[in-house]
């Protein structure tokens, strides 16, 4: 049996040899908002013509576990295309309705201008989840466009014990994107394809829901490629996340994930 190499995610001085544990911020109920302080707001003079894209992520633990926006930013730097400047408003278990009611996301949108605002909630494979996703996509979209941005939808995935829900999740996010003429970022579809093609590439973390480093790498490939419109075939398997942070995916796994990500639209 061939021994498998493990992905390594280093966030600052914290080494995670594998995915976030079940005691992550999501399970502890700790809200996360990356680059969402005054210094970030004061640094919003980036010029799109100078090769910058400003992206706001609104979501929950599917976004903040492994810090997806940070990985997307790292990919933009490694790729040599427009540099992404990302902010994140994300709280455990939040739907778009929760974000709308709390108000932080709406205020962050108003702090624009943005190029893209990426919306995400849970898999939304049920009728109720789909209704919430579509309804609040309709509510957020005018605010997003007023801020000079295009709405985008980060399609996520169901729990590992609910793989039958992939189709419902994909349909929900496609409908939301279609209704507001937004961009679809089909990470969930890429996950489904990857699991079918090579289930030995572990996308799920130990809780069977949140992503491993490989899962976050795949999701980030889809998000970065979808927003930048640049090819991702040569994206490095090792990324510098700034400071001491880094993400390292085994070369063989990274090759599989790049090919899968390039095949979804």
What are these regions (language model features)?
Residues 1-4:
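Positively charged n-region of N-terminal signal peptides that target proteins for export
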Residues 6-17:
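Bacterial N-terminal signal peptides
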Residues 17, 22-27:
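Boundary at the C-terminal end of the N-terminal hydrophobic targeting segment
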Residues 23, 35, 41-45:
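A cross-taxon signal for low-complexity, glycine/charged-rich
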Residues 30-31:
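N-terminal basic, low-structured, amphipathic or hydrophobic segments
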Residues 53-56, 62-135, 145:
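Conserved SGNH/GDSL esterase-like catalytic core that processes O-acyl groups on lipids
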Residues 106-217, 221-226, 230-236:
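Alpha-helical cap/lid subdomain in secreted, periplasmic
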Residues 210, 221-265:
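Conserved catalytic region of serine esterases and O-acyltransferases that act on ester linkages
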């Amino acid at each position: 049996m061939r021994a498998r190499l493990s992905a390594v995610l280093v966030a600052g001085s914290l080494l995670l040899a594998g995915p976030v544990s079940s005691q992550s911020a999501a399970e502890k109920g700790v809200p996360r908002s990356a680059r969402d302080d005054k210094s970030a707001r004061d640094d919003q003079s980036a010029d799109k013509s100078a090769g910058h894209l400003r992206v706001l992520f609104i979501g929950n633990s599917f976004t903040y576990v492994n810090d997806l926006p940070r990985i997307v930013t790292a990919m933009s730097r490694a790729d040599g295309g427009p540099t992404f400047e990302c902010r994140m408003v994300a709280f455990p278990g939040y739907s778009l309705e929760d974000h709308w009611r709390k108000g932080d996301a709406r205020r962050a949108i108003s702090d624009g201008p943005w190029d893209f605002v990426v919306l995400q909630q849970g898999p939304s494979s049920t009728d109720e989840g789909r209704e919430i996703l579509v309804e609040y996509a309709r509510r957020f979209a005018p605010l997003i466009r007023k801020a000079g941005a295009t709405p985008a939808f980060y399609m996520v995935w169901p729990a590992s014990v609910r793989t039958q829900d992939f189709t419902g999740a994909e349909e929900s996010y496609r409908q939301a994107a279609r209704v507001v003429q937004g961009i679809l970022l089909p990470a969930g579809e890429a996950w489904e394809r990857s699991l079918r093609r090579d289930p030995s590439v572990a996308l799920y973390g130990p809780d069977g829901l949140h992503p491993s480093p490989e899962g976050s790498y795949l999701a980030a490939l889809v998000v970065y490629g979808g927003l930048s419109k640049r090819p991702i075939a040569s994206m490095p398997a090792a990324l510098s996340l700034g400071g001491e942070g880094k993400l390292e995916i085994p070369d063989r796994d990274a090759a599989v994930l790049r090919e899968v990500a390039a095949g979804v639209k």
